[in-house]
Every structure is written in structure tokens, then in C-alpha cells.
């Protein structure tokens, strides 16, 4: 039989079809997925690519404009210029060199935004340094760049509402693409009617009927695919509607799997015959409450404690879900509350919740999340409420779990409330250090300090009732840490009633208890330093000074821990400020000298790390030092410290330099001030002072000339008031004190410098010259005469100071200075000669023989000469 009749028709007999084997076309062994069939490759032109790049950058610039991010806008504008340069060939070819309208629109909008921001002077002053610099640079670059598009920009400003060219083209192209993508609906072919095969004699009729109905389908299949299997024609075909339903079900199933993996589905009930969709809620996925106990179990305190032990046993393990553990503990506490199992059990469960909250943060060095910290405060506050409400309830770490009493009073629960409080306070400090100190977030976090202080007060009540003296000392020290750096204006009032308790009285009570009952030196040391700091903050100079001298902390503080050393540095800095406010300049300089001469007061006060010293420490050391930093609201103004130090050094150093001008052995009192003064004197041209340090140096040079008015104007002016003096308590008194001290020290400098010119000086003239009371001038001159700083005598009837000529003139002083230097040179040469021996000797004698015999004689001559010179100096 020919192969063209292999497929045959229904009209042929079965015997003829069985004689020849049917040759079938091989079926393909691969299939195409629906995604591959639906995906179409899109070919874009160069114009579309370049324009899409420009539109993306313009979109980012608009986002930067919304948030007023000038730095990012500048970077995006520079990127836009580069992108337009790359698109220039396309613009030249497609647009005849005319810039597209959407690009011109972006330039105009950016220019209007920059001009508006530049004209708002107040808002521009409030910008950060980086944003202000970026705004200036962006304005200059934009003005320069838009000069090439002046014609297009002017045309755009005439009719800005006209739509962009690319938008019209996009809309037209999208319409065309939609028209092209509309499928041509074909007329559906009628499906063959299928019915079950008839019995016996009806079989031949049925086969004839089927063949007549399927001739057209066979012919179409043969044309498309060649040969086909006859059996496939009788299989039930899937209609288009059923196929669409299958695709929809498949898409829904895939979407469900994706949502389940991302955790966005709230709940889905699955049954044998299918499931139902539920509403998706915002936020994290929620789950059913964990089942604690069986339905029929009798819940009592022992069962709850057993369940608590099972939950706590997983604490600290590697794969423990901390969030799930917290949920279990909360559910367990709810169950105990529903069954009314007692407040002691509630206290134990809350203690476990607090411990779990502390464990939730895996890294101890990182700050806790604010929401979890708030939960900590709430739970600890509830614990304190329970303890204050039940006097027969004790929470202590000395109680063993076997000895706990949770059902019958007196209740005994294992735990340590004071440890929880200390951890809570430390986490609060970490939260403050993590925030930007110049943001509103820091202010919001700082408001929680009131909650922490109130909680510490309540914990102190519990500890005073049930705790040991050492625990009371720990609680009081936490209260002191939140109290010592705060200024209380009531404490400086003189009309305050004696019954009202100020912070000074509170500090006195807390510190005295620690002095008497502390068993460790650390708590006592920190209490003393905090007490000194608080006294100095309220200008109690003598109390603070006496407490420091009696404690001898300056001798042992170098052996303390770093946090105590930081507190010592802060205390000395504040003590120096207190001494300066009280007019004790020498004491202020002594307190601040060791801190400021190191050149790194910022690090010593734990107020930040210097970037230029990063190579001196490793990453671990830097991490540790950052953990020791103080919160921003506890910082001491470094510029204020430096100004006080420089002014104190000026008031001490300038009169001393005038008194010992020709002394070769003169020592420097303040090395830092001396270096700044020498650097200023070496400059050929000295401009007007700008910084605080330049003001102090200019004032020192004016005082050295005796011009006290210029000196006072350099120290006290509007700029210095805003930067320094207005930051002090009692700024007006400080400025008045500065004026008095500058006049007095200028008078002393004048007398030291020009005393050799006068035979006598009128005290009344000096008082008028320096605008000081005559009694004060008389006191200063008398003190200088008594201290042998000024060789003179006072004539009371004439109110004059008679100067004596016993001191050498300038020429004599220079000659004496030269003689001292020559004598030192001779001594040094003789020592070198003695050390080298007779190696410089010429002659026939052996090396070293003659000089070795002469050495004792030479040493005796040198000693005699030195003794004679010392005697002459003593006689002078």
C-alpha cells in the first residue's frame, strides 16, 4: 500500500489498515513554556536609549528638588551634562540640533528652583555647610551651561504649557502599538460532536458519521503538521475558555507562593477541596497565638513556672528565635494573669521578659531599638509598682530558685532590680550617642531622661527598703550621674526658704551616704568627683577646692578605670571655669594647664575623636573609645575652655615677661600661649583678629604695650560675647571682672616695663591712667614693693612712689647677660677638652701625659672661678 494512504479515512476497512504499518511523524522531545512563548524581544533605537537616560536623570533631579538636597542635585546635574553630550549626535540627526523640549523644561525648572533658593537668605543661612557650598557651585555651573540654550529657553518660557515633543511621540507610538497588538478575532470552528460508541449493528453507522464530520480537520492537520495520529482527533479538546481558566489558576498559585515566601499574607485556610483568600494587612506578618497548655490541663503556678523554665532553657542558644521567645513569655504572662496566679508570679514573668528584651540585641556595643527600650521601661516600672505595693515581696539575686515563694507570703523572687536599672540606663546612653545631636530625634530621645530619672527615684525607694548598703550606694550613684552636671537656678537664690531641697542638698545627702558606706573605692571616687563638679557648677569654689585637696585624688586617679579618669578631667575643667568666674586666675590656669597643653582636650573629655590621630589607634581601640564618649548634652564647650585658658595665661604671662625681660633663665609659665604669641610676633603683617585665639593673642600684645583699652576691646566685644562669655552663668559679672583684672595687670606690666625711666610716680596719675580706685593702686604698688618686684618706697603725704636706681640699666643688663653666656661657653669648652684628653696637644710628649697631670689643677681653677662669680652676683 502506498505511504500516501497510510493515514487513511474512516470509510476504509479495518483489515486494509492493519496490513501496512502506519508511519508516524516523530513528536518533538522538547516543549516551550508559556513565559517563553509570551516574551517578545523589544529592539530600541539609539534615540530611545539616549532619551530614556536623560529622562531618568531628570527624574532623579526632581526628587532631589523635593527634599532640597543640593549636593545630590549638583551631582545629578553634572551627570545630566555628560548624558546630553553623549546624546548630542542623536539630537543633531533627529532634531536638527535643537534640544528636546523635555530637556529644556528640566533646565528651566532647575534654574527657577536654584534662583528661588538663592534669594531666600534666611533659609540659605540655615543650610548645612555642604548644601550651602553645593548651592553656590550649582548656581554658577547652571548659569554657565544655560548660555548655550538661551534661544530654546526663551521659546519655552513664552509657552511653557505646550506638551513636550517626546510625550506626543510616545502617546502616538503607544496608540499605534496598541493597534498593532490587538489580536484578530478568528471565527471559532465548530467542534465535532462526540457521543459514546453505539452497540452491535450501530457501530458501522457511527464510524461513517464520524468520518464525514472530521474530514475538514484531517485535511487541515495534514497541511500544517504532515502526518498525524488518528486517535488524537477523537480526544476531547480543551476549549479557549478552559485554557484561560487554567492559566488564571496557575498565576494565582504562583502569586500565592510568592506572597507566602515574603511574609505578606496574614492567614490562609487550606482544606481538601480548596482554600479562600483573606485580606492582606499592612505591616509584618501576624500569626496565631502560641498554645501554651492543653485544653484540659489544670493551670497553676507550678505549671507556669515549669513552662517558664522550658522557655528560658532555650535562651542564649545559637538558633533561638528571640522574637518568638518574647511572644511566648508575653502569652505566658497573659495566661497567668487570666488565671489570677498572684503578683509574685507576675513579677517573675516580667523579670524574664526584661532579660529576654536585653538579649534581643545580639551586639552589646550597638544601641537597642527605641521601641524595645520603651518596653523595657514599661516592664521595669511595673516591677517597681508591684514591689512598692507589696511590702512582703522581695526581689533579690541572693534568693535561689529552689527557695522562691510565689504562692504564699512572704513572697521571695529571684532577680536583681538594680542590675536591670543599670542596664536600662546604659542603653539610654547608647541611644543618645547613636542619634545626631543636632536633630530633632536627639531632642525626642532626651525627653525620656525624665522617665529614667523618675524610675531611678522609685527604684531607690525599693532599694532603701529591701537592699543592702552596697546596693543603696549603687542606686544613689545612678541618681548622682543624672544630677551632677545640671545647673539648679534655685541653688544660687538668696531668698530661698530653708525647707526647700535643692540639687546641692540632694547631692550632699547622696554623696555623704556613699562616703560612709561604700566598700569599693570606685563608687566613692566617682561620688567625690561628681560632688566637686556640682559645687563648681554653682560657683562654690572654696567647697570644691577643699574637697579635691582633702581627697588627694590627683595622686591616685591615674590608677583608676578610664571612665573615672574621664570624669576627673571633666571635673578639673569645670573647676577651672569656676575659679575663673570667681576671679582666681592662677588657680584657673593651674586647673586647665594640664588639660590644654596636651593638645587633645576633646579626647581627654570624651567628646569626640580627632581624625588626624586615626593612624595612632587600631579599629578595636577606636571602637572602645567611641563607647566611652559622653552624650552631647553633657559636653563642655571646648572653645570656652581654650579662651579661659588663654586669657588666664595672658594675665599671668605678660607681667612675668615684663618683669624678667633680661633674665636668661626665665621659664615659660604657659608653653601654648608663648608659642602662639611668638608666632604672631614673627609675622610681617598682622591683620585684624578673626578667631577666638587671634583675639587672645592680639589682647596680649596690647597689654604688653600697656594699652589696656585695646586689650579689653579685643577680649570683650560682640563676637567674643556670642562665642564665649554669654555661655557662662552670670556673664555680666564675668565681663566686669575681666575689665578689672585687665586694668590691674596692665598697671603691673607698665611698672615693670617703664620703672627705670621714672624717678617717682604719682599714684593719683596711675589711678587716672588705668581708671582704678586710688586705694586699689596703692594696694598693688605696696604688694609689688613687699614682694621685691619693684625697688621703690611709698611717700604717703605726696602719694608718690619713689623709685630707686639700684637695678641695672638696659646696657648693664645686656652686659651681664653676655657675661653669663660667655661663662657658660667657657665651661662647656673645658668639659669637652677634659673629655678628649691631650689629643689636641702638639710637641714631643706622649698623648695625654701632660694633660693628665694638669687635670686636678684645671678643675680646681674652674671651681674657684665659678665660686667667685657667684659671690659677685650675690653682692650685686
Curated annotation (Swiss-Prot):
Residues 154-172, 182-192, 848-861 have a biased composition (Basic and acidic residues). Residues 632-808 form the PCI domain. Disulfide bonds: none annotated. Residues 11-20 have a biased composition (Acidic residues). It holds the Pfam family PCI. GO terms for molecular function: RNA binding; translation initiation factor activity; translation initiation factor binding. The keyword Cytoplasm applies. One of its GO terms (biological process) is formation of cytoplasmic translation initiation complex. Residues 206-219 have a biased composition (Low complexity). Residues 1-25, 154-233, 839-876 are annotated as: Disordered. Belongs to the eIF-3 subunit C family. Component of the eukaryotic translation initiation factor 3 (eIF-3) complex, which is involved in protein synthesis of a specialized repertoire of mRNAs and, together with other initiation factors, stimulates binding of mRNA and methionyl-tRNAi to the 40S ribosome. The eIF-3 complex specifically targets and initiates translation of a subset of mRNAs involved in cell proliferation. This is Eukaryotic translation initiation factor 3 subunit C. It comes from Bombyx mori. The gene is eIF3-S8.
Amino acid at each position: 500500500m502506498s505511504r500516501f494512504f497510510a493515514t487513511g479515512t474512516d470509510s476504509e476497512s479495518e483489515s486494509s489498515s492493519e496490513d501496512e504499518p502506519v508511519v508516524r511523524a516523530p513528536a518533538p522531545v522538547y516543549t516551550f513554556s508559556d513565559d517563553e512563548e509570551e516574551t517578545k524581544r523589544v529592539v530600541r533605537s539609539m534615540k530611545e536609549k539616549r532619551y530614556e537616560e536623560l529622562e531618568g536623570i531628570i527624574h532623579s533631579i526632581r526628587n532631589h528638588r523635593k527634599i532640597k538636597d543640593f549636593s545630590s542635585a549638583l551631582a545629578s546635574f553634572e551627570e545630566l551634562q555628560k548624558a546630553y553630550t553623549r546624546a548630542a549626535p542623536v539630537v543633531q540627526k533627529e532634531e536638527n540640533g535643537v534640544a528636546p523640549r523635555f530637556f529644556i523644561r528640566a533646565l528651566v525648572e532647575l534654574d527657577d528652583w536654584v534662583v528661588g533658593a538663592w534669594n531666600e537668605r534666611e533659609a540659605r543661612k540655615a543650610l548645612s555647610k555642604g548644601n550651602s557650598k553645593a548651592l553656590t557651585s550649582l548656581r554658577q555651573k547652571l548659569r554657565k551651561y544655560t548660555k548655550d540654550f538661551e534661544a530654546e529657553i526663551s521659546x519655552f518660557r513664552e509657552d511653557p504649557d505646550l506638551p513636550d515633543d517626546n510625550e506626543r511621540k510616545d502617546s502616538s507610538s503607544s496608540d499605534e502599538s496598541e493597534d498593532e497588538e490587538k489580536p484578530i478575532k478568528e471565527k471559532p470552528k465548530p467542534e465535532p460532536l462526540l457521543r459514546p460508541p453505539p452497540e452491535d449493528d450501530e457501530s458501522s453507522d457511527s464510524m461513517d458519521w464520524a468520518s464525514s464530520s472530521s474530514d475538514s480537520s484531517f485535511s487541515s492537520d495534514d497541511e500544517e503538521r504532515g502526518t498525524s495520529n488518528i486517535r488524537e482527533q477523537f480526544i476531547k479538546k480543551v476549549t479557549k475558555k478552559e485554557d484561560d481558566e487554567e492559566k488564571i489558576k496557575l498565576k494565582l498559585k504562583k502569586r500565592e507562593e510568592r506572597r507566602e515566601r515574603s511574609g505578606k499574607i496574614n492567614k490562609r485556610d487550606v482544606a481538601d477541596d480548596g482554600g479562600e483568600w483573606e485580606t492582606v494587612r499592612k505591616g509584618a506578618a501576624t500569626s496565631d497565638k502560641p498554645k501554651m497548655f492543653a485544653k484540659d490541663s489544670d493551670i497553676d503556678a507550678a505549671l507556669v513556672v515549669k513552662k517558664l523554665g522550658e522557655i528560658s532553657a532555650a535562651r542564649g542558644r545559637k538558633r533561638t528565635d528571640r522574637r518568638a521567645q518574647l511572644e511566648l513569655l508575653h502569652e505566658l504572662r497573659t495566661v497567668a494573669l487570666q488565671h489570677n496566679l498572684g503578683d509574685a508570679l507576675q513579677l517573675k514573668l516580667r523579670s524574664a521578659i526584661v532579660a529576654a528584651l536585653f538579649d534581643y540585641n545580639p551586639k552589646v556595643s550597638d544601641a537597642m531599638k527605641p521601641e524595645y527600650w520603651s518596653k523595657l521601661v514599661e516592664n521595669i516600672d511595673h516591677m517597681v509598682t508591684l514591689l512598692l505595693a507589696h511590702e512582703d515581696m522581695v526581689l533579690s539575686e541572693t534568693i535561689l530558685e529552689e527557695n522562691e515563694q510565689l504562692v504564699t507570703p512572704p513572697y521571695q523572687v529571684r532577680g536583681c532590680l538594680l542590675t536591670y536599672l543599670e542596664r536600662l540606663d546604659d542603653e539610654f546612653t547608647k541611644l543618645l550617642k547613636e542619634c545626631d545631636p543636632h536633630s530633632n530625634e536627639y531632642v525626642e530621645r532626651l525627653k525620656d531622661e525624665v522617665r529614667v530619672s523618675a524610675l531611678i527615684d522609685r527604684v531607690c525607694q525599693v532599694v532603701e527598703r529591701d537592699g543592702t548598703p552596697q546596693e543603696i550606694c549603687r542606686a544613689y550613684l545612678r541618681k548622682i550621674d543624672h544630677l551632677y552636671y545640671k545647673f539648679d537656678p534655685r541653688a544660687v537664690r538668696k531668698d530661698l526658704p530653708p525647707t526647700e531641697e535643692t540639687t546641692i542638698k540632694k547631692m550632699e545627702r547622696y554623696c555623704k551616704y556613699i562616703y560612709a558606706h561604700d566598700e569599693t573605692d570606685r563608687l566613692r571616687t566617682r561620688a567625690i568627683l561628681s560632688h566637686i563638679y556640682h559645687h563648681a557648677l554653682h560657683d562654690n569654689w572654696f567647697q570644691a577646692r577643699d574637697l579635691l585637696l582633702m581627697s588627694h585624688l590627683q595622686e591616685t586617679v591615674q590608677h583608676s578605670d578610664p571612665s573615672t579618669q574621664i570624669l576627673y578631667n571633666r571635673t578639673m575643667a569645670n573647676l577651672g571655669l569656676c575659679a575663673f568666674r570667681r576671679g582666681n586666675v592662677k588657680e584657673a590656669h593651674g586647673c586647665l594647664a594640664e588639660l590644654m597643653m596636651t593638645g587633645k582636650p576633646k579626647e581627654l573629655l570624651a567628646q569626640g575623636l580627632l581624625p588626624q590621630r586615626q593612624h595612632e589607634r587600631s579599629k578595636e581601640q577606636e571602637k572602645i573609645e567611641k563607647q566611652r564618649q559622653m552624650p552631647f548634652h553633657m559636653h563642655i564647650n571646648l572653645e570656652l575652655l581654650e579662651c579661659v585658658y588663654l586669657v588666664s595665661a595672658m594675665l599671668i604671662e605678660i607681667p612675668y615677661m615684663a618683669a624678667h625681660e633680661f633674665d636668661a633663665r626665665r621659664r615659660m609659665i604657659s608653653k601654648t600661649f608663648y608659642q602662639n604669641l611668638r608666632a604672631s610676633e614673627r609675622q610681617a603683617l598682622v591683620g585684624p583678629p578673626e578667631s577666638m585665639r587671634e583675639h587672645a593673642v592680639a589682647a596680649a600684645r596690647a597689654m604688653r604695650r600697656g594699652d589696656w583699652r585695646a586689650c579689653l576691646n579685643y577680649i570683650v566685644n560682640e563676637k567674643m560675647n556670642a562665642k564665649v562669655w554669654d555661655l557662662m552663668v552670670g556673664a555680666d559679672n564675668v565681663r566686669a571682672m575681666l575689665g578689672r583684672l585687665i586694668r590691674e595687670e596692665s598697671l603691673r606690666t607698665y611698672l615693670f616695663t617703664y620703672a627705670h625711666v621714672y624717678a617717682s610716680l604719682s599714684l593719683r596719675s596711675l589711678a587716672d591712667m588705668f581708671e582704678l580706685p586710688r586705694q586699689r593702686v596703692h594696694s598693688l604698688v605696696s604688694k609689688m614693693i613687699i614682694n621685691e618686684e619693684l625697688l621703690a618706697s611709698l611717700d604717703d603725704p605726696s602719694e608718690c612712689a619713689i623709685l630707686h636706681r639700684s637695678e641695672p640699666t638696659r646696657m648693664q643688663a645686656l652686659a651681664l647677660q653676655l657675661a653669663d653666656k660667655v661663662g657658660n661657653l667657657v665651661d662647656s669648652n673645658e668639659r669637652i677638652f677634659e673629655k678628649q684628653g691631650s689629643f689636641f696637644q702638639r710637641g714631643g710628649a706622649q698623648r695625654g701625659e701632660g694633660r693628665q697631670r694638669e687635670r686636678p689643677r684645671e678643675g680646681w681653677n674652674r671651681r674657684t672661678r665659678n665660686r667667685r662669680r657667684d659671690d659677685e652676683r650675690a653682692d650685686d
